[in-house]
Curated annotation (Swiss-Prot):
Organism whose genome encodes this protein: Saccharomyces cerevisiae (strain ATCC 204508 / S288c) (Baker's yeast)
Protease in keyword set: yes
Lineage: Eukaryota, Fungi, Dikarya, Ascomycota, Saccharomycotina
Family in the record: Belongs to the peptidase C19 family.
Pfam families: UCH
Superkingdom of the organism of origin: Eukaryota
Compositional bias (Polar residues): 481-495, 920-932
Purpose of the protein: Involved in the sorting of ubiquitinated cargo proteins at the multivesicular body (MVB).
Miscellaneous field: Present with 606 molecules/cell in log phase SD medium.
Protein name: Ubiquitin carboxyl-terminal hydrolase 7
Localization annotation: Cytoplasm
Length: 1071
């Protein structure tokens, strides 16, 4: 599309103007629609999406050029018309609902128009007028005379299907008979399907570790005097309430039950507030040369520390109960584990505060974490509080999201390890981490300030807040002598103020409801050879280098020179597998896929893994969970098979950087191997943020289906080495026009130019389907065909009708997913000015026009009314286009044969070489035309009414069918909360009458608005996505929170209704 620097904000020599929000502007917007847009709107909706996108870009360029040449009137006209294209014409166009790479261009164009800050008033005015237009269109049937409904999608009643579900397979040939007899259910049955609601969440639903007491005992946690051990339980979040403190209490520990018995209500906590999960270290950060730091006898001890760290937490209300007490706060050593720049501008106020830079925990020379506490003590030797840390009753450390996103290793665990294993300064208490970190502390203080009227500045140091600046100015006025010169005054005002003295006000007893818990039962000692623990199942062979923790030095008395690194690695692998060799390991699969399905822990065997929400990343987490459940897609990246399809280095030296595919593979491997844990997708998010900084990860909420399109588009570009893809997926290059019931010549022309010409990839084999759009003139029988591909099928939700209940009350009927598909594929009869301007018999056609001449007719809008340069589709203009992922800019040129812009770059290099439409419209006399007239019989049809039938058919459907329900209106501020009933088994009929049968395995739900809403997902984690009762395994994923959901359908309940369902994932199955 456009270059990155286009836009008035990036052109210092362009002086933008800002139209006022006025009645005059409103009249200008309305006049342009009624005098110009309205006349062309019906015809423009029938144009190819790619042509509309190119013309919208042209209008934006015309707007910039008019501003540059000081023509504000022309600039305003071009911008208003461009807005109508972006927010009205394109979303209502014929090909918009089939989402392919062209959709990514549309989203970027939309952002360019919205990012013109000086034209914000114009955008608001246009959106308001579009709302009026669409409301009128709904009242008058959108110009559609009537619909011819075709039952292209259906599901069968439960009684007919329950006996067939078990026979479904993923391996046999597709059935040919769709058998419509008895397949449509009654409305009463649809209304009786259960309405799904999110399950109630409990404390243990937040994943910590995949450890079951009966499977993995923990001898390292036994107290010396005890004869029996208490199994380690996953730690839980504590109640988000302040703690009680009574002045006559002498001990906190005497009032507390054991820490492991404290429970909490997860529903009152927030998914974003927890840092308490598994931190993964990218294997790329650890050199294989440092593998000799591992010791096979130390694995059990490291896992013990890992468990203890996850249990050693303190909530923000509990820390507040300590810091608000004049006696207990002196017993706390608070460690700010953040980069110094962050600590300098804000931190928790405490009498004994130490800032430890996480970068100090990494040895840059050896590229490993430091493993001796005396190294850290030497670096912090001037800090008396840290040196005397063993004299404190409480040691609490905290971090924040920005530091976590900056540091690439698990600094929290390294710090915990150094503190707990220190021989020089043994601690009397276990260090605890502040649950939720700085962000949770800040949120808690704001809550208390509103409820209890505490002063935030007494507990939070923020020198640049408004209140702090006022206090600073008052202190300077009181302390500054009159004789001080102005230079000194200016210098002192620029310094960062010192933290306030510790004098918090006394708080009412009602604010302190519970004292903090004592440390966990006991602290493991550091033996020479610690007791062994059964390890988590590790990756076989090549993938075994992925480690959950940085290397920790060995303490076994073995000389390093006696063993080389290969021997140590071999011993380590033998030790890791000795407990599971006969139970778990199977013959090695192709591409070294690790095998864990036989684990007795269901969370491990099914790889049920939570994902950390680092701010507003729930839209990414929910989509990743569904993609991870798509077996074909998951295997491609877990097996590393994807590497054989990466783009080779180019002759000119430039090449694709396969960052996204590599980071997705690493993320999938972590999720696969760490069932029962919550994984932090830091590396993956960093790559996405690098490729698409406009998404503003992790701060802004985005549309999850737009993220899916970005992900699939990029993966397609990276995995498009044509030679290897063609060898492994020859089906992508082959087709049988007769079997597909398509016109051989027209389809072949489109297929060669757009499918093969644009490049193929494994993503196409999994997600790509094909559509046929046709326009048939009922007056002369002339028909034009247009083909396109899609990754996501975006469906509008039909308007709900009212029905009377048995009690005589009117209720809104639910909408079936099959109805959404059938409305999408139904034939539309267009008449009057909404009819297609047939090039043979339409208003602009010449009676003497021959059929041969018509076949070369360019696809542009024509009308009796004279058009200005704003409305002619500029698809042949030579110009530059934006490479969305930094691959460079290319020039387009015209083909000699048609009016469509052709690009010489490879498929993955050009955003305009999309799966949009054919290079030219194919035309023929339709075989089912009733008239069958040609130009020689023009007198026979000249007196007939001009009527057009618009038809959409599925030519092919993908292995994984992704359906997006379009719940948000054009301006994304309103949401359609209609209850949609969706089936577990879905049948869709192709154009050739073959029936494709699909099985539901994933759902993305959305609650709230697009800006302030929340995404969750439902996934059938059964390895074969079985829907039989007792075998289906539906799990509800809310970031790190995971819960089994037994209400989400089975072979006895094949339909589910929900007002939150947003994206559905279906997998093709065969009888």
């Amino acid at each position: 599309m456009l270059d990155d620097d286009k836009g008035t904000a990036m052109h210092p020599h362009i002086t933008p103007f800002t139209p006022e929000y006025s009645n005059e502007l409103l009249r200008r917007v309305q006049d342009l629609y009624h005098e110009d847009i309205k006349h062309y709107y019906p015809q423009l909706k029938l144009e190819k999406l790619l042509d509309l996108l190119e013309h919208t870009e042209y209008l934006f360029e015309l707007y910039l050029d008019s501003i540059h040449h000081d023509r504000p009137n022309d600039a305003l006209t071009a911008f208003i018309i461009g807005c109508y294209y972006v927010f009205l014409i394109i979303p209502q166009s014929l090909q918009f609902q089939t989402r392919n790479k062209s959709y990514s261009i549309y989203t970027d164009l939309k952002k360019m128009y919205e990012n013109e800050m000086n034209m914000t008033n114009v955008v608001l005015m246009v959106k308001k007028e579009i709302g009026v237009v669409l409301d009128e269109s709904v009242k008058h049937g959108a110009g559609i005379e009537h619909r011819i409904t075709k039952k292209r999608a259906f599901s069968v009643p439960a009684d007919d299907l329950s006996g067939q579900v078990a026979s479904l397979s993923l391996d046999t040939a597709a059935p040919q008979d769709h058998g419509l007899k008895g397949t449509f259910t009654e409305d009463d049955a649809e209304q009786s399907s259960p309405v799904w609601t999110a399950p109630n969440l409990e404390p243990n639903d937040q994943l910590k570790l995949a450890l079951l007491p009966e499977v993995i005992p923990t001898p390292a946690f036994r107290e010396p005097e005890r004869k029996t051990s208490v199994p380690v339980r996953p730690s839980v979040l504590l109640e988000d309430v302040p703690s009680i403190y009574h002045e006559d209490d002498t001990s906190f520990a005497s009032l507390n039950p054991p820490f492991r018995e404290i429970t909490a209500d997860r529903s009152v906590t927030h998914r974003k507030d927890s840092y308490h999960s598994v931190y993964m270290v990218d294997s790329g950060n650890l050199k294989e040369d440092n593998d000799d730091l591992f010791n096979v006898e130390n694995d059990g001890f490291i896992q013990s520390l890992d468990i203890l760290q996850k249990q050693s937490i303190i909530t923000a209300p509990e820390l507040f109960s300590i810091l608000s007490n004049r006696v207990e706060r002196e017993k706390v050593l608070l460690i700010d584990l953040r980069i110094p720049q962050r600590s300098a501008i804000n931190h928790i106020v405490a009498p004994n505060l130490v800032n430890v830079d996480p970068n100090l925990l990494w040895d840059k020379q050896t590229n490993t974490p430091i493993y001796k506490d005396d190294i850290l003590e030497h670096l912090l030797k001037e800090n008396e509080n840290f040196i005397n840390r063993n004299k404190f009753d409480y040691i609490v450390y905290y971090t924040d999201v920005k530091t976590f996103m900056t540091i690439n290793f698990d600094y929290a665990f390294i710090f915990f390890y150094l503190m707990l294993t220190s021989q020089k300064t043994p601690l009397t208490t276990v260090p605890t981490t502040l649950l939720g970190g700085y962000e949770k502390w800040k949120k808690t203080l704001h809550s208390y300030a509103q409820e209890y009227h505490i002063s935030i500045e007494d507990y939070l140091y923020r020198p640049y807040s408004q209140k702090a600046r006022l206090q600073q100015e008052q202190q300077q006025q009181q302390q500054q002598p009159d004789s001080q010169d102005s230079f000194s005054a200016k210098e002192s005002s620029t310094k960062v103020p010192e933290p306030p003295s510790w004098k918090p006000p006394d708080l009412p007893i009602r604010l302190r409801k519970r004292p903090p818990p004592p440390p966990p039962v006991s602290m493991p000692t550091t033996p020479e050879i610690p007791p062994p623990l059964p390890p988590k199942i590790m990756v076989h062979s090549q993938v075994s280098s992925i480690s959950r923790k940085p290397p920790i030095p060995a303490k076994q008395h073995v000389k390093k020179e006696q063993l080389n690194s290969n021997e140590i690695i071999q011993r380590k692998r033998q030790h890791q597998h000795q407990h599971y060799d006969q139970q778990i390991l199977q013959p090695q699969r192709a591409y070294n896929i690790p095998t864990i399905e036989r684990s007795p822990n269901v969370y491990v065997s099914l790889s049920i893994t939570g994902l950390r929400n680092l701010g507003n990343t729930c839209y990414i987490n929910s989509m990743i969970q569904c993609l991870f459940a798509a077996k074909t897609f998951r295997t491609l990246f877990i097996s590393s098979k994807y590497k054989s399809y990466l783009q080779p280095i180019r002759s000119n030296g430039s090449h694709y950087s396969p960052k996204l595919s590599n980071s997705l593979s690493m993320l999938f491997n972590k999720m696969y191997l760490n069932g029962g844990c919550s994984v932090v997708p830091t590396g993956f998010l960093k790559v996405i943020n690098q490729l698409r900084p406009d998404l503003k990860i992790p701060d802004d909420q985005q549309d999850t289906q737009e993220f899916l399109m970005i992900l699939l588009d990029r993966l397609h570009d990276e995995l498009s080495d044509q030679q290897h893809v063609a060898n492994d997926y020859p089906n992508l290059l082959l087709y049988n026009a007769d079997a597909l019931k398509v016109s051989n010549n027209e389809y072949k022309h489109w297929f060669d130019k757009n499918v093969i010409g644009n490049g193929i990839s494994p993503i196409d084999d999994i997600f790509q389907g094909q559509m046929e759009n046709s326009l048939q003139c009922k007056r002369c029988g002339y028909t034009t065909f247009n083909y396109s591909t899609f990754y996501v099928l975006s469906l509008a939700i039909p308007r709900r009708s009212m029905k009377l209940s048995k009690l005589g009350r009117s209720t809104e009927k639910r909408v079936k997913l099959e109805d959404c598909i059938n409305m999408f594929t139904s034939d539309e009869v267009l008449s009057g000015e909404n009819a297609w301007d047939c090039p043979r018999c339409g208003p602009t056609a010449s009676v003497s026009t021959s059929v041969s001449a018509l076949e070369n007719e360019p696809s542009i809008v024509k009308s009796k009314k004279k058009k200005s340069r704003f409305f002619t589709l500029h698809t042949g203009t030579k110009r530059r286009h934006l490479d969305f992922f930094g691959d460079g800019i290319t020039e387009g040129h015209n083909s000699n044969n048609n009016n469509t812009t052709i690009f010489e770059r490879e498929r993955s290099r050009s955003p305009f070489r999309m799966l949009g439409g054919s290079g030219k419209r194919s035309s023929s006399s339709t075989p089912f035309s009733t008239g069958g007239n040609d130009s020689n019989n023009s007198s026979d049809y000249k007196n007939k009414k001009l009527t057009t039938v618009k038809t959409i058919n599925f030519v092919t459907l993908p292995k994984i069918l992704v359906i997006h329900l379009s719940r948000f209106y054009y301006d994304l501020t309103k949401k359609n909360n209609t209850v949609v009933t969706y089936p577990l088994i879905l049948n869709i009929i192709l154009k050739n009458n073959d029936t494709m049968k699909y099985k539901l395995f994933g759902v993305v739900n959305h609650t709230g608005t697009l800006i302030s809403g929340h995404y969750t997902s439902l996934v059938n984690k059964d390895l074969e996505h079985n829907v039989n009762i007792g075998r289906s395994k539906w799990y509800y994923f809310d970031d790190e929170v995971v819960k089994a959901d037994r209400k989400h359908g089975s072979d006895k309940n094949l339909k589910i209704s929900s007002s939150d369902v947003y994206v559905l994932f279906y997998e093709r199955v065969y009888d």
